UniProtKB/Swiss-Prot annotation:
This is Phosphoenolpyruvate carboxylase. One of its GO terms (cellular component) is cytosol. The active site is at H164, K595. Its EC number is 4.1.1.31. It comes from Rhodopseudomonas palustris (strain BisB5). The gene is ppc. It holds the Pfam family PEPcase. HAMAP family: PEPcase_type1. Its cofactor is Mg(2+).
Amino acid sequence: MSSTILPTDPDVLPNRADDSAFIEEDTRLRNDIRLLGRILGDTVRDQEGSAVFDLVERIRQTSIRFHRDEDKPARRELEAILDDMSASDTVKIVRAFSYFSHLANIAEDQNNIRQMRAGSTAGSAPRAGMLAKTLAHAREEGIGARELREFFKTALVSPVLTAHPTEVRRKSTMDREMEVAALLDQRERLQLTADEWAQNEEQLRRAVVTLWKTNLLRRTKLTVLDEVANGLSFYDYTFLREVPRLHSALEDQLGGGEGGEAEEELASFLRMGSWIGGDRDGNPFVTAEVLQGTLRLQSARVLRFYLDELHELGSELSLASHLAPITEDVRLLAERSPDHSPHRRHEPYRLAVSGIYARLAATAAKLKIDSVRAPVGEAEIYANVQEFKADLDAIHYSLTKYNAGVIARGRLRQLRRAADCFGFHLASLDMRQNSAVHERTMGELMDAARPTSSYLALDEDERIALLTGELRSARPLTSIFIKYSDETVGELAVLHEAARAHSIYGEAAIPQCIISMTKGVSDLLEVAVLLKEVGLIDPSGRCAINIVPLFETIEDLQACAAIMDRLLAIPEYRRLVDSRGGVQEVMLGYSDSNKDGGFVTSGWELYKAEIGLLDVFEHHGVRLRLFHGRGGSVGRGGGPSYDAIVAQPGGAVNGQIRITEQGEIITSKYSNREVGRNNLEILTAATLEASLLQPRRSAPHHDYLEAMEQLSALAFKAYRGLVYETDGFVDYFWSSTVINEISTLNIGSRPASRKKTRAIEDLRAIPWVFSWAQCRLMLPGWYGFGSAVEAWVAEHPDKGTAFLQSMYQEWPFFRMLLSNMDMVLSKSSIAIASRYADLVPDEELRHKIFGRIRIEWHASVDSLLAIMGHERLLQGNPLLERSIRHRFPYLDPLNHVQVQLLREHRTHDPDEQVLRGIQLTINGISAGLRNSG
């Protein structure tokens, strides 16, 4: 029997005879998957024996029958196979299917890279999402290079990396998987000899065997600083080199000078952000000490990068003084260099670079960061990154002035851009805390200062009056003679540490303070008073940090425009906004609004909130910057970034956008340099498209807005009716999903729930969505849509489905909503979900709730296909359709095994091997779905 773990069933992988190019590409992808499947099969057979390999094949084939036909005999056969397996064999089976999911993902990613390269080398027309396409569109609209350069002077595109409480990837496995990817890439790019081809396969086998021998799961729980270190690895993989390169490429495309050089340097607009190490909301482990450690780790990463680049630059700039004249500034840099080697006496550029290296190494040493290589001598530290940039600029100017501009456009160009984008802090670290914590902290401080009053008893108007008075007052609110609670001491310590960080790394190190669960004006004023207390607001009213409200629930989204209208009318607060350049950032939360009101209503209320905020900010003459808290899954606002950005209301982007890149998708988007570069380009192109080109389009038709409001109300009623108003739903959820078992995984530093209750209201949105994904229902990404459409069509027989079809064709927002739902429903499986429903011990409850879910699922699929004019899910997305067909024969068995293990875990005494098996299935299913929560 062949040792190939590979789908061969024609119903699993049909060809597309209507598209020869697609078939050719599909064949190459299948060949890669076949290669990796064969190597994995050989590994399983060699390491675990033929019996285990044969068992893997039996489970896979039976699972395919069950998936295709909901075959009841196949279901019984599958259950019998799983019942007979030992605990140790179960773990081996799970690892085999999990690793195939990982390897199939690698093959798929490499195929996507291959297609990007093929399009580029063949001179194909640029795709939507590529900068070339957007720039061509701008030219068609009469927008020239000069106008575009002006646009980027005030533009901001900021991907913000977050940790993820259900991120299941280990760096050890990621490193080996990247090795596999590199070897596949080598087979594609290089013309290998027969010996080299054999050697390549041998290296692949070595990597796969190493993977098989490597723990998929962590043995210990991550600390926050572990999460920081994991996040920093993506700077090595992608950001430190690709962010500068993207700027250079765009700069060249906008240039008109000889040889393609830009007429003027493009302003840096792409800035990395992070929550990892600064997000305190619900994470008691993020302390002042952790904040300090995070900033030091970030700074160490970027300073070591600069030092490495300077070392290489010094090797390259061997220009002799009698062959290459220099400016006075470079002469002074060379004279100040501690490098006194006679061999470099007549190489002023090398001397200048060695002096810069020495100063940067001294700066790193002061920050207690070891440099990779010792400098040639002692030097004065850099007071700030501006001094470092000025020295690099001096070298650039000298090279350019004396006819060596081509040299300046090499490594030096990228280093100068990196210094401008990353500074000495690498990424802007946001602080985030829940408004309730700020409220308690302020209450304690106020009551200690005014023993006769009770701050928490005040109404909103009274709080606003008191807080604005504090902002006007010069006296401090805290006292060293008062003993405060541990919580208050901790909050003040974090803010003091932020102030200290500004003095060390610059204000860009911590530019935002985000208030989650913002409910009113006082929530922002409380933070302003706390910032004033630690010196982040000075006596003149200058604020050194942006105060950012985060509106998360449906109710808060509906109130956000009124809250900001009242806030911006307060002179004491408006003065703070003016000190920040007249820009106020507002964050919108996709996750909690979805958990609160369902997918349809969440999307619609977010859209309306943006329109309301635009009106308010225009009235007050303040620039609005939106920060989108999108998750990786559609249930938390995920989906294609380009479509999401260009579907924003006209004027909502306005040249500036911040957007979260959630932990569970960072790996797939940024672990590969080419893929990462493409994703950064997509964000940039979408921001440009939405800002300069979208406002010229007409607003959505009034009838569309009215219909969407009605659909939202109907979907909201259906969703809330199930999740919050159905007796027993909480019990059903906790019994039919892995929510209990998720808490045992060593995959994040933050607890899964805000409080120690089983209430849906207290559960974090991420594990909520993650749990529904694991059982293959994906309920947060579609529930309520089908019944809403059916009810709306029944109420509007004159318009009917044809009207909704027009909405889909003409309105980008509605099209994006349905496209994302199409993706979610395609990954769901009612057949598999029914097996999870069987875990609910109360038979009546099981039939009542799963019966409703099944009916709604079918209604949603039927309504979606009718509106899109499709006959099957993903008909308009053949790439994703193919991806799912490749992966699901290996994903479905993991679900079946997980159900079996959950039943055993919950009905027998605790067994470490069973629990480990459950954890492994969680990892494998997450990999197979390619998003986890």
